Amino acid sequence: HVVVGTPGRVFDMLRRQSLRPDNIKMFVLDEADEMLSRGFKDQIYDIFQLLPPKIQVGIFSATMPPEALEITRKFMNKPVRILVKRDELTLEGIKQFYVNVDKEEWKLETLCDLYETLAITQSVIFVNTRRKVDWLTDKMRGRDHTVSATHGDMDQNTRDIIMREFRSGSSRVLITTDLLARGIDVQQVSLVINYDLPTQPENYLHRIGRSGRFGRKGVSINFVTKDDERMLFDIQKFYNVVIEELPANVADL
């Protein structure tokens, strides 16, 4: 049997003996960096305290912050570290552009202008907070744009329904956060917009890779304010790419 759950739910099931620790042979912590950055550290530690000592543990993470390494030191016995070489992280097939936005509050107008210009099959818009997901969703709907939204504060059933609608094509625009970026596998996604640049260069690949999956071509457009210029530079250096300014003939992309 395989049990999949959030740290809080898994800990609760272990505590109530709905999951018997002595029967568990393997524990996998996926998206460890995101889990830790979202405040699940205490719950993850509580789970490890209830697990039997001789258990196989796998920790998967796009990045290796100190908090993730601390888990390997505290709870793993002679762990083997497997790293993916940076040259295996590819953005091939994805056209990447940026748009200079002088002020944060002008991003919304820029986004609406793009949607009036581009011919889009399906697209994903990334922001950095759950609150901003809700805010941008309300603003877009207020301008008669049909959009869906998903983030970690929604219950799993609601998120599943939204993703089914998006995969089926009945919903064409999805607004979300980094936490869910790595689980979006939709073949028809042709455009990713970083309304907010990611806070870490490593997450850029997980975001814009949504538009180039399954060998398809894709486009990513990054909104860049003055405060974002350093991160844009870091992203280009990290992936050894040049991100061009969005051309005037944007409709031809």
From Swiss-Prot:
EC number: 3.6.4.13
Domain Helicase C-terminal positions: 93-253
Motif, DEAD box: chain positions: 30-33
Single GO cellular component term: cytoplasmic stress granule
UniProt keyword RNA-binding, yes or no: yes
Segments passing through the bilayer: none
Catalytic activity, as annotated: ATP + H2O = ADP + phosphate + H(+)
Keywords: ATP-binding, Helicase, Hydrolase, Initiation factor, Nucleotide-binding, Protein biosynthesis, RNA-binding
GO molecular function terms listed in the Swiss-Prot or TrEMBL record: ATP binding; ATP hydrolysis activity; RNA binding; RNA helicase activity; translation initiation factor activity
Biological process annotations from GO: cytoplasmic translational initiation
Superkingdom, natural source: Eukaryota
Residues annotated as domain Helicase ATP-binding: 1-82
SMART domains assigned to the protein according to its UniProt record, in alphabetical order: HELICc (SM00490)
Quaternary state and interactors: eIF4F is a multi-subunit complex, the composition of which varies with external and internal environmental conditions. It is composed of at least EIF4A, EIF4E and EIF4G.
Recorded family membership: Belongs to the DEAD box helicase family. eIF4A subfamily.
Primary role: ATP-dependent RNA helicase which is a subunit of the eIF4F complex involved in cap recognition and is required for mRNA binding to ribosome. In the current model of translation initiation, eIF4A unwinds RNA secondary structures in the 5'-UTR of mRNAs which is necessary to allow efficient binding of the small ribosomal subunit, and subsequent scanning for the initiator codon.
UniProt name for this protein: Eukaryotic initiation factor 4A-6
